[in-house]
Structures are given as structure tokens and as C-alpha cells.
């Protein structure tokens, strides 16, 4: 049956610009992050929190714009989107203002309702009197009985107790109680004989009543984010279940009675403490989605191969030492998550899983793949082998990359890209070879005509092939932390280039042709040996970020004033930089500037000591362009 999610609240997040004293590495595309098979949003506990500080006015690296706004930590509701567990949020926990007419000792608790059209909780009152939470629940049950309601949503209503009168709601087909403070369920819950969907996620349940087995029609049971230390025995008696969510509990053991749930098509045991999976898993032959990620599994039972209808199997972030050969029986498999385990090898039988479109084994200890494995998986579009122990590309030749659009080999020990390895990869647009041992690039690099993103950062490259100018579709080029002494003049032919990262090389100069990169938005030259910048840099009118700190610059060209879109400028740690051009004040969009450890002796000491804002003001005041 369809799962309603129209009332799922969205939590507004705010952010504001912060001062950065050193540029961060930019332009590097992130490695593939795998996938979550139950498609749920992250809880507030798992979301990163952003901590910001207001810029100091007396620092020499600072935000030139006005500071404002506040930082809010990420938070999402557990409402459902397409493919998620059931349930929608129509109310949120809150304690709005109580009626001033009531004595404090008898003031009822206020329930706030979050309306779909607004992010602001609104107190619900009737005739000036706040509704008591428990009384409200009882009234809802009474209404359910009288009107034969089919769907009842009491999510996020600060409910702590479900009253026995729930037994009267026998007409219910969908019952949503997620996001409350319920620690136990009454036995009367077993009277809801027509119930098909029961959402109890984000509560404090430690057990379930045996009467739950009376729910003979139950299809979907959501118990995510509770406090279950084991799978309650009564769950194994719910033979009609097709979808079971047990994510983020404290479950350590999965019992053999799991075999009783033969109707399951979706099972999520993600983020528990499971060390072993019973062979009984093989009885769940209707399973299409199985999420066992973020547990402590070291091995899988051979019986996993009996789950022949699986299309998605997520095993990432476990302690797996091996994968059974029976994995090859899962001929319908489309997504297989193996990231961050302890695998040293991949079974040959995986070549039978020809419907897979992504192969991701990031964060293991694999040094080689079975011969021809990738070539057999002809539908692959994304290959991620990053953070392993590869010394060379997988054997299989050009055929293994025929339909691939993205390859990530970051953080391995590869010292060579074979000539012609991508000769059949006509759709390859992204290649990440960051943190390897490359000393040179293949002579046929000019044939990679569809390439959009190249990352060769943190290798040992001493030069770039002149043919790099043939990559007419290239938009992002990362060459940071290499040993480059020069950039070929042909760099100017990369007309679509938006990001060029040359940080931490040995460059003493830049070709004037760099000014031909009219689409360039981010240019990173930090930590080189540059003594000057070409005047043609003024032609980069789309540039928003320029980092030339930690060089040997003696001056900045006057043409820098034509960079009308420049927002961030880092010129820190240039020991010979004694003055700045007045034209710098023409960069009206400049918001962040770093001048730490630059003498700037041509400027008054009190101006330099006042930081970038005062420096810019001084340049404006004394500039011959001040009337402009």
C-alpha cells in the first residue's frame, strides 16, 4: 500500500560565512559514500554540527563582510520520503506558553502542532484552554471509534503512555506513533486486528507485548531508534510482515526464528551490535532489500546465497574478513555495499551479478580483483577502489571500463596508468588518482576527450604532458602536492576549466596563457615558489577564489583590480610582499582576505596592524580611482 509522506516537516537550517585564515583544499570531488538501503534521513545524533566563530577585527586574516546569523546544528525529522518506512509527522514535541489564567499547579501540558505549510510550531488551544496531551490521545481514540478512522497519526505529540482505550480503534489500518516518549505498549494494542502499518520509531521501547502477534494483517513494522537489546520473540510470530525496520537499536543477536518471517521483502538491521548472522537468513527468499551495515559482522553464512531475489545488499562498515562464494547466486543484485570492512579479496562468483551498476569496495585491504571481474559486470558505471592496497589497475584491460563514467582509485599505491587502459572508456568523465605513487602520466592522455574532472593530487608528478590541452571538456583539474616546476603553455586551451589546483608544487612562474581560462572560478597556487603573477591574470573575470599564499611574491599585478567577482583572496606568508596595488580596492565583491605574515612595509604600520578591512579602506582612500 502507498505510504503517505505529505506532512513530513522540513527543518530550516541556517548558515553564515565564517573567517578562514588558510585556504582549504578545493575542487576535489568526494569519494562515493555508499548508500543507505532503508533510505532514511540521518538523525540529529548522526548529523555533523557546524561550529562557527565571528571573525576578529584585529586579525590579519578576516572576513571583510559583515558577520551575522547564527549557526544551527543539522537536524532532520524521521518522516518518510519515497521508499522509506511509513509515517508522517503532523505534530512536534514542544512546550508552548500556557494560559495565564490558570494556576501554575494545574496548568495542563501544551501540545504544539507543526503544520506542513510552516516550520514554526503553533500552540493548539480550544476556547482559550490548552489541550492536555493524555486527554487529547483519549479523545483521538474515541473519535477513531466513532468515525471508523483508517489512518491515525499521533507522531511527535509528547505521548508517554498509550491508554488501554486503544483497543477501540479496530478500524485502523495505519497507526503512526513515531517521535514520542513511549517506553512500553499496552496489551490492548493487539486488538487492532486490521492494522497493516505500525510506526513506532524514535521512542524508548525496550520490549513489545506478546499480544502483538494478534496483528494478523500487519505488513509494515517500524522500530527504528528505540532501545531494544534483542529482537522481541513476538516479532518472529508476525508471519505477514513484509517490511521490518530495526535500525539503530542495541540488538546483539539475531535468532534462528528469523526463518519464520518468510514474507519479508525489506529488512533493516542497520546500526546495531550484531556479530553474527544466522543461517536462517537463507529462508527469507522474498527479500529484495537487506541492510546489515554498521554492525560487527566478520563473516556471512553461506545461506545468504539463497536470498535470490535480493536487489540491494548493504554490508558496509562491518568487520567482514571474507565474502562467501554463494554471493554469486544473487543474480538480481543491483547494489552491493562493501565499503569499510577488512576484506582482502573478492569472490570470483561475483561476476554473475551482472545487473550491478556500481562497484564500491572503498576502505578495505584488497590488492587485486579476480581476472576479468569488472569486464563481466558490463553494466557498471561507477567503480570505487579507493583506500585499498592496489599497486596497479585491475587486470582485464580496456574492456572493464567500457560503460564506466567514474573511477576512483584514491589512496592506493599505483605508480602507473597503463597506456590505452581507457581506450574503450568513451563515457569516462571522472578520474580520481589522488594519493598514489604516480611519477608520470600516460602519453595517450590526450585521447581522454570526455574527461570533466581529473584529480592527480598528492603524487610525484614532475611534469604534465603537452597533450593535456586536448581535454577540451575538462572543468576540474587537481594537481596539488606534486613536484611540478612548470605548467605547459597549452594549459590555455582548456576553455571550460573552472577549478585549477596547483597547491604545493615547485612552480616559479605561470605561463601568460593562463589568462585564457575565462571560465576559471577557483585558482589555487598556495605553497609554491612564485615570484610574480602574470598580468594576464586580470582576464580571469569569473574568478571568485584566488590563493597565492606561501610563495615568494614581491608584488601583485595592477590587473588584479579587474577581478570584479573575486570574493576570497589569500596572499598570506609572502615574505617579500611589501606593497599592494591600489587597484585591489576595485574588487568590490571581496569578502575574505588573508594577509598574515606579509611585511607590507609600504603601508603605514597602524593600517597593516588593523587587518584586511583597514588595508582595503586605506587603498580606497588613497587610490587614484577613489572617484570611480
UniProtKB/Swiss-Prot annotation:
Compositionally skewed regions (Low complexity) per UniProt: 69-92
Segments for region (Disordered): 23-130
User: From start to end residue, where is composition biased (Basic and acidic residues)?
Assistant: 104-120
Which stretches are LRR repeats? Answer: 148-169, 171-192, 194-216, 217-238, 240-262, 263-284, 286-307, 309-330, 332-353, 355-376, 379-400, 403-424, 427-448, 450-471, 473-494, 496-517, 519-540, 542-563, 565-587, 589-610
Q: Where are the transmembrane segments?
A: none
Task: Give UniProt keywords alphabetically.
Answer: Leucine-rich repeat, Repeat
Which one Pfam family would you cite for this protein? Answer: LRR_14
Q: What's the family?
A: Belongs to the SHOC2 family.
Q: What does this protein's UniProt record list under function? A: Acts as a Ras effector and participates in MAPK pathway activation. Probably acts as a regulatory subunit of protein phosphatase that specifically dephosphorylates Raf kinase and stimulate Raf activity at specialized signaling complexes upon Ras activation.
According to UniProt, the name of this protein is Leucine-rich repeat protein soc-2 homolog
* Source organism: Culex quinquefasciatus (Southern house mosquito)
